[in-house]
């Protein structure tokens, strides 16, 4: 039997009190008490229960972290067993086998068969920082390319890669020098006005031409160490590039000895129906940055990288808590669960996408529906003809959905992402889509 969402009052009295204290004592700048006043008390599977007894479907997965579901019994058991043994003994100076076991599993799952190593961290931002250091240290090249609308983190160095929203940069200039941004091949809306769904090769070629004709005018190719990219842009709007784009980019980069640094922090660990999102595109990246879902809710991240560009001398890189033994134990179990779930993710992902495509045909304000697996999104516009962005309506839809028990998150300027835990069933998707359509209608009034 499907347990449906049940919301009596949002926010309820207990939630209101917690939210008031939250803003008094915590320096938070990303929470949205107007549209998402949800104060979690516990989670189970795809459901979240708040402090006032309201029940929600979590189609945000804790911002892409809870891929195997809230409090998955196997993950909880792995955490308990490890916590009873020891909770910390830093990899900076000491050794424990589970850190090696997880690294072996991740390397085995990486595309291709080149020799690789893993360096651990705690967050996606840390993983991207480590990747930048690996590229600089391993190649001697000090400059990077990244994409407009990309998100790679908010710490000072990786903020130079991030180009998602100007508010993320406001007050922090100068960021690290040596990063040049290029257009991402967004099939729906791009600099050149190309319909990338109808002309994917043309869109791909325009991006490569931009690098060669404009970037290389002022950045020497031999000084560029890597191109940082997301196989599907996350915070930029869940944008899926043309199928052949990354193969073309890899061929182009190889001509100049430039590495590809694949940020899988949000799209990896089974989210798209493949363990790594880049597998959909048939490319073997030189570095794979991972995070979010790998720890099953605990802080864990890292970089899988070519062994020939690794840190090979003492003291070049370390982090006290990177590869924490409790998080590693959770990660080992997460990998096994996700491997079992991959066929299911492809099936229910297609099922969810069909709903979104139907909504696109039915409603003038849904300009695009896109995604792979359970990384899906719709883009909200004022009209299909003009494609004018409609962020105000997007926010109202998110608010109305939450009031009815469906937790959604925006992405990009005007899109909504649908990223439930990978264990979601078709019946639960039916309920969620019923709620979403009700919320959409209410927001349009």
Curated annotation (Swiss-Prot):
It is an enzyme of class 2 (transferase). It comes from the Archaea. Disruption phenotype: Disruption mutant cannot grow at all in the absence of L-proline. The modification N6-(pyridoxal phosphate)lysine is found at residue 292. InterPro entries: Aminotrans_3, Aminotrans_3_PPA_site, Class-III_PLP-dep_AT, PyrdxlP-dep_Trfase, PyrdxlP-dep_Trfase_major, PyrdxlP-dep_Trfase_small. L-ornithine aminotransferase involved in L-proline biosynthesis. Also shows high activity toward L-lysine. 2-oxoglutarate is the best amino acceptor, but 2-oxoadipate also leads to moderate activity. Homotetramer. Belongs to the class-III pyridoxal-phosphate-dependent aminotransferase family. This is Ornithine aminotransferase.
């Amino acid at each position: 039997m499907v347990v449906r969402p049940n919301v009596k009052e949002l926010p309820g009295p207990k939630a209101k009190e917690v939210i008031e204290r939250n803003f008094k004592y915590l320096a938070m700048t990303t929470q949205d008490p107007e549209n998402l006043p949800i104060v979690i008390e516990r989670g189970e599977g795809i459901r979240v229960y708040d402090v006032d007894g309201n029940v929600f479907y979590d189609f945000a997965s804790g911002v892409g972290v809870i891929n195997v579901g809230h409090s998955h019994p196997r993950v909880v058991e792995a955490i308990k067993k490890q916590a009873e043994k020891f909770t910390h003994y830093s990899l900076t100076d000491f050794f424990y086998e589970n850190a090696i076991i997880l690294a072996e599993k991740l390397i085995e799952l990486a595309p291709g068969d080149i020799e690789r190593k893993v360096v651990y961290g705690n967050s996606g931002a840390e993983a991207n920082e480590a990747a930048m250091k690996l590229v600089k240290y391993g190649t001697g090249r000090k400059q990077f390319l990244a994409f407009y609308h990309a998100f790679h983190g908010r710490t000072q160095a990786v903020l130079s890669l991030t180009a998602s929203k100007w508010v993320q940069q406001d007050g922090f200039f100068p960021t690290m020098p040596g990063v040049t941004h290029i257009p991402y091949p967004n099939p729906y809306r791009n600099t050149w006005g190309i319909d990338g769904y109808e002309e994917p090769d043309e869109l791909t070629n325009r991006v490569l031409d931009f690098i060669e004709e404009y970037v290389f005018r002022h950045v020497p190719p031999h000084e560029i160490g890597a191109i940082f990219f997301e196989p599907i842009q996350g915070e930029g709007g869940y944008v899926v590039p043309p199928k052949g784009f990354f193969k073309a980019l890899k061929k182009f980069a190889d001509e100049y000895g430039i590495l590809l640094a694949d940020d899988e922090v949000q799209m990896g660990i089974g989210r798209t129906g493949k363990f790594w999102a880049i597998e959909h595109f048939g490319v073997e990246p030189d570095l794979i940055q991972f995070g979010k879902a790998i720890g099953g809710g605990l802080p864990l991240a890292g970089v899988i990288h070519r062994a020939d560009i690794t840190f090979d001398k003492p003291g070049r890189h370390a982090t006290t808590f990177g590869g924490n033994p409790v998080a590693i134990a959770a990660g080992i179990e997460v990998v096994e669960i996700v491997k079992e779930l991959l066929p299911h993710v492809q099936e229910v992902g297609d099922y969810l996408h069909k709903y979104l495509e139907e909504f696109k045909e039915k409603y003038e304000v849904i300009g695009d529906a896109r995604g792979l697996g359970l990384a899906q999104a719709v883009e909200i516009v004022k009209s299909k003809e003009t494609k004018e962005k409609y962020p105000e309506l997007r926010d109202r839809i998110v608010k109305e959905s939450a009031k009815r028990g469906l937790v959604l998150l925006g992405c990009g300027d005007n899109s909504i992402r649908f990223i439930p835990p990978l264990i979601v069933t078709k019946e639960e998707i039916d309920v969620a889509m019923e709620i979403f359509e009700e919320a959409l209608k209410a927001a349009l009034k």
